[in-house]
Curated annotation (Swiss-Prot):
Residues 1-61 form the MADS-box domain. Induction: Epigenetically down-regulated by vernalization. Vernalization repression is initiated by VIN3. Repressed by silencing mediated by polycomb group (PcG) protein complex containing EMF1 and EMF2. Up-regulated by HUA2. Down-regulated by VOZ1 and/or VOZ2. Down-regulated by RBG7. Accumulates at elevated temperatures via a JMJ30/JMJ32-mediated epigenetic regulation (e.g. removal of the repressive histone modification H3 lysine 27 trimethylation (H3K27me3)). The keyword Membrane does not apply. This is MADS-box protein FLOWERING LOCUS C. Putative transcription factor that seems to play a central role in the regulation of flowering time in the late-flowering phenotype by interacting with 'FRIGIDA', the autonomous and the vernalization flowering pathways. Inhibits flowering by repressing 'SUPPRESSOR OF OVEREXPRESSION OF CONSTANS 1'. At elevated temperatures (e.g. 29 degrees Celsius), maintained at high levels in a JMJ30/JMJ32-dependent manner to prevent extreme precocious flowering. The gene is FLC. A motif (Nuclear localization signal) lies at residues 8-15. Residues 80-170 form the K-box domain. One of its GO terms (molecular function) is protein dimerization activity. It comes from the Eukaryota. The lineage of its organism: Eukaryota, Viridiplantae, Streptophyta, Embryophyta, Tracheophyta. High expression in the vegetative apex and in root tissue and lower expression in leaves and stems. Not detected in young tissues of the inflorescence. Before fertilization, expressed in ovules, but not in pollen or stamens, of non-vernalized plants. After vernalization, not detected in ovules. It is found in: Nucleus. It comes from Arabidopsis thaliana (Mouse-ear cress).
Length: 196
């Protein structure tokens, strides 16, 4: 008779849970060791118990070396994934243009079915809408930047206008002080004679 299938869910009894953890951890370590020996693979295994105790296993290579290799590979994979997503974005448009070129240039035009043309048109419309959305986004950012610049220039203009007004008042007061009997003359400002 075979074993009955155990439902995979959290074991409520603490002692049963600990026994199961120990047995399964040992089984997992044994499987990792077998994989290392049979396939000549570098294997690193980390297990953390519910109480926070760390159990580890590593084959021939040092655990730290294996984890360093994993870290480097993972970083490279992330970079490649980022480049791939950018390339897919640009590549899909490039592929679409190549598809249009192959379907509609030369003698191939006569052999293209209506369904293929409809599908090609849908792809072109999708690419066009994506391009328009990106263009709109960039234009909105540009408008926002220009509005911000306009606001700064208006504020600067107000500051300069108030400074000019203050300078004008100071100049007018100085002129009034120099004219005889407080009268404002339309003539040029009075200058002092040169001293000999």
């Amino acid at each position: 008779m075979g074993r009955k299938k155990l439902e995979i869910k959290r074991i409520e009894n603490k002692s049963s849970r600990q026994v199961t953890f120990s047995k399964r951890r040992n089984g997992l370590i044994e499987k990792a060791r077998q994989l290392s020996v049979l396939c000549d693979a570098s294997v690193a295994l980390l297990v953390v118990s519910a109480s926070g105790k760390l159990y580890s296993f590593s084959s021939g290579d040092n655990l730290v070396k294996i984890l360093d290799r994993y870290g480097k590979q993972h970083a490279d994979d992330l970079k490649a994934l980022d480049h791939q997503s950018k390339a897919l974005n640009y590549g899909s448009h490039y592929e679409l243009l190549e598809l249009v070129d192959s379907k509609l240039v030369g003698s191939n035009v006569k052999n293209v079915s209506i369904d293929a043309l409809v599908q090609l048109e849908e792809h072109l419309e999708t690419a066009l809408s994506v391009t328009r959305a990106k263009k709109t986004e960039l234009m909105l950012k540009l408008v926002e930047n220009l509005k911000e610049k306009e606001k700064m220039l208006k504020e600067e203009n107000q500051v300069l206008a108030s400074q000019m007004e203050n300078n004008h008042h100071v100049g007018a007061e100085a002129e009034m002080e120099m004219s005889p009997a407080g009268q404002i003359s339309d003539n040029l400002p009075v200058t002092l004679p040169l001293l000999n």
